[in-house]
């Protein structure tokens, strides 16, 4: 008796470890519907087989039964639940092809997929360097005007050789009143050489000087 108990535990553990899934058998749909009702009422996640659930399709009693009894079995197997449902279900190591994405195996451990982040290569734009345009300065040629030098008009002086008749003083009269031709530097006034009263004035002065000299001589004699 003491030997049979450990053996039964080992067998049960071996059976559980290999029975990854709990699936409904092909048969009477009423029996399968009862299995669905029992599983959904005792902790199975039956929202998946609702019309808006992810496992609603294919919409068959067999598919919905597989999802319901498997969900119940995965949650309750650790506490002693079996995959029987009054003969409507049995354990299986492989999931059905119709609902494989909706069934989770008890002994299957999924390998997490680590996504490799995609590092985008930054695009560096090549800066465009414009070539500066250097304008050629225009140097204007200065225009030098030729100065016009005027030649002064030098008048030729008219030198008159007019010899007039001598006047009363014995001096010839000239047609020009200037001493130097072309100029006005000649003496002007009543005391010049052309004064007609010059002889009379000179005579009076001479007589005066003679008179004075005579008086001085008389005084010296006395």
From Swiss-Prot:
UniProt keyword Ion transport, yes or no: no
Residue ranges listed under propeptide: 198-222
Disulfide bond positions: 22-83
Lipid-attached positions, GPI-anchor amidated asparagine: 197
Post-translational modification: Contains two additional disulfide bonds.
Signal peptide stretch: 1-19
Coiled coil: none
Segments of this protein annotated with the region Disordered: 88-199
Biased composition (Low complexity): 88-187
Cell compartment(s), UniProt: Cell membrane; Cell junction, Plasmodesma
UniProt membrane topology term: Lipid-anchor; GPI-anchor
SMART domains in the record: X8
GO cellular component, one term: mitochondrion
Native source organism of the sequence: Arabidopsis thaliana (Mouse-ear cress)
Keywords from the UniProt entry: Cell junction, Cell membrane, Disulfide bond, Glycoprotein, GPI-anchor, Lipoprotein, Membrane, Signal
Pfam families assigned to the protein according to its UniProt record, in alphabetical order: X8 (PF07983)
Record protein name field: PLASMODESMATA CALLOSE-BINDING PROTEIN 4
Keyword Ubl conjugation: no
Major subcellular location class: membrane
Molecular functions per Gene Ontology: (1->3)-beta-D-glucan binding; polysaccharide binding
Domain of life: Eukaryota
């Amino acid at each position: 008796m003491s030997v049979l108990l450990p053996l039964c535990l080992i067998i049960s553990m071996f059976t559980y470890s290999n029975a990854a899934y709990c699936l409904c058998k092909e048969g009477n749909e009423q029996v399968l519907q009862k299995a669905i009702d029992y599983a959904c009422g005792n902790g199975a996640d039956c929202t998946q087989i609702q019309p808006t659930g992810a496992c609603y399709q294919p919409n068959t009693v067999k598919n919905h039964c597989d999802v319901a009894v498997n969900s119940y079995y995965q949650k309750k197997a650790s506490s002693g639940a079996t995959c029987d449902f009054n003969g409507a279900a049995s354990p299986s190591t492989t999931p059905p092809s119709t609902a494989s994405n909706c069934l989770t195996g008890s002994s299957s451990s999924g390998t997490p997929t680590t996504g490799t982040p995609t590092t985008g290569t930054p695009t560096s734009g090549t800066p465009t360097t414009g070539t500066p345009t250097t304008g050629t300065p225009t140097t204007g040629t200065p225009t030098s005007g030729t100065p016009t030098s005027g030649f002064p008009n030098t008048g030729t002086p008219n030198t008159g050789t007019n010899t007039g008749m001598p006047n009363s003083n014995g001096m010839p009269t000239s047609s020009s009143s200037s001493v130097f031709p072309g100029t006005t530097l000649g003496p002007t006034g009543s005391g010049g050489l052309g004064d007609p009263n010059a002889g009379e004035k000179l005579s009076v002065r001479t007589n005066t000087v003679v008179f004075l000299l005579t008086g001085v001589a008389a005084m010296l004699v006395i």
